[in-house]
Amino acid sequence: MNDLKFDPNVKLILASARSHAMSLSHGQVTPLHLGVTLISDLTSVFYRAITSAGDGDISAQSVVNVINQSLYKLTKRNLGDTKVGVAVLVISLLEDSQISDVLKEAGVVPEKVKSEVEKLRGEVILRALKTYGTDLVEQAGKLDPVIGRHREIRRVIEVLSRRTKNNPVLIGEPGVGKTAVVEGLAQRILKGDVPINLTGVKLISLEFGAMVAGTTLRGQFEERLKSVLKAVEEAQGKVVLFIDEIHMALGACKASGSTDAAKLLKPMLARGQLRFIGATTLEEYRTHVEKDAAFERRFQQVFVAEPSVPDTISILRGLKEKYEGHHGVRIQDRALVLSAQLSERYITGRRLPDKAIDLVDESCAHVKAQLDIQPEEIDSLERKVMQLEIEIHALEKEKDDKASEARLSEVRKELDDLRDKLEPLTIKYKKEKKIINETRRLKQNRDDLMIALQEAERQHDVPKAAVLKYGAIQEVESAIAKLEKSAKDNVMLTETVGPENIAEVVSRWTGIPVTRLDQNEKKRLISLADKLHERVVGQDEAVKAVAAAILRSRVGLGRPQQPSGSFLFLGPTGVGKTELAKALAEQLFDSENLLVRLDMSEYNDKFSVNKLIGAPPGYVHWS
């Protein structure tokens, strides 16, 4: 027997069957010994298939009682497996006449058991995919709602519905929401809001890191990838793969000298046997994917642009309930609007909506942390009480000193006053804390009930959906409303995330003072001339002209798609032309370092123009 053709589980089963035959003093191992070994494992495919095909555990027990023979050596059947697996072993076993007779005698139909094994074998194939990935459709109910992006999702659906080259690749800057488009597709598949060819499809997010991990020998990575691709092919169009950072497929496992994944993917992608969604950034796509023309032409590009500030505000409003439920806080709408505006203005190294969402998330986490920490007023009083108790303990030892006795009396009186002041505050704090904790618990319960309601509606379980929608959920909603109404009187604890919390987080990220962030844009523009005069002395006409031009542009009186202002400062050396430009940059962009200064006196020579446009081809620094 060639052990290399059997997976480890089968080897264990065969060894166990052999031991069982030896314990019964039988001269050979027959299919019946193998049957006893398989059915004795309550988690095995054989046991589960018999219980499903028959009368549950009763049928399995009947089979155990009838089987008392030994095992017959099996050969691999043509089921497309590279190795003999447990499912193949069971199907081969069912074809044996002895086992068939035993099952019939036990009241179980062999054909029905075989069909159940085939069904379970399909689950095993899907489990192989899940080893290196995650089914996004299964998790769709727990994912964040996808607001907007309908055009991109529709484009992805259209590409997936093609006959060949049905592989969309999402291209966009980091943080614009490429993965969210795929999550939106998963939610549509779950709801059934997709064409027939995508109904019931599994959307598997493949992790190349998990596939590469532990591949110490050459060929191990390719073997894993081939098993995944074979599982997708056997699913016959019911599985769509998604790989984030698709450019990794062009370099996965190259360091060990192995073939990169793209060479294994190309044939199936071209024939349409594999439906595949990729995602990568513009820079990575240009650097890695475009260089491999054969790989690139098998994909259809779907560009994901950065959303505008109004679109970001809509996205934040859609995510509001999720973050409120997770953190147990309430988010004001003004905080969401300010988050989008401040992140666009001050956080320049990242993209919307990612930076705005992170801003809201951190603000919520900060407020939640403050809720879990004792208020400063109570903490200060408790420290004073502890300090006085220590002093009393020390003074009580000095009974002969009259001054100590007088001080002891004074300290005791002060301690009683502090305790009288601390007790009502502690009671109020505990009451407010209890209300907040109960509100958190009810909101979490509401989220769980909403997920259960969506599941009941998908399964068309009308009675259960009605009980949840008009019973349990409404009761929880009314309880939450009642608690939130009573929480409005909270003085010591606040669970509200407001604009001041957003401004505080932006200040921590950027170093810009909170007072400047809180300043209204309208007030800043009106006082622009005065602020410029604080730095530029004199030059009234120039300052007035600059301030008026900026004000006209910002209020919308200027031409659209034009700069806020274009100024030509003329005058002799030293009168303040550069200083006015620096002051203007400081007022508009909060730092004079954000001014790009080109000193044209440095460009007198012909060759110095290379400083602006770069070196010509063939010269150093050309790229």
UniProtKB/Swiss-Prot annotation:
Sequence positions that bind ATP: 172-179, 571-578
Start and end residues of each stretch annotated as I: 129-375
Taxonomic classification: Eukaryota, Viridiplantae, Streptophyta, Embryophyta, Tracheophyta
UniProt xrefs under CDD domains: AAA, RecA-like_ClpB_Hsp104-like
Protein name per Swiss-Prot or TrEMBL: Putative chaperone protein ClpB2, chloroplastic
Family: Belongs to the ClpA/ClpB family.
Repeat 1: annotated span: 6-71
GO function terms (MF aspect): ATP binding; ATP hydrolysis activity
Repeat 2, as annotated region: 77-123
Residue stretches making up the Clp R domain: 1-123
Keywords: ATP-binding, Coiled coil, Nucleotide-binding, Repeat
One Pfam entry name: AAA_2
Coiled-coil stretches: 368-462
Keyword Membrane assigned: no
The organism's place on the tree of life at top rank: Eukaryota
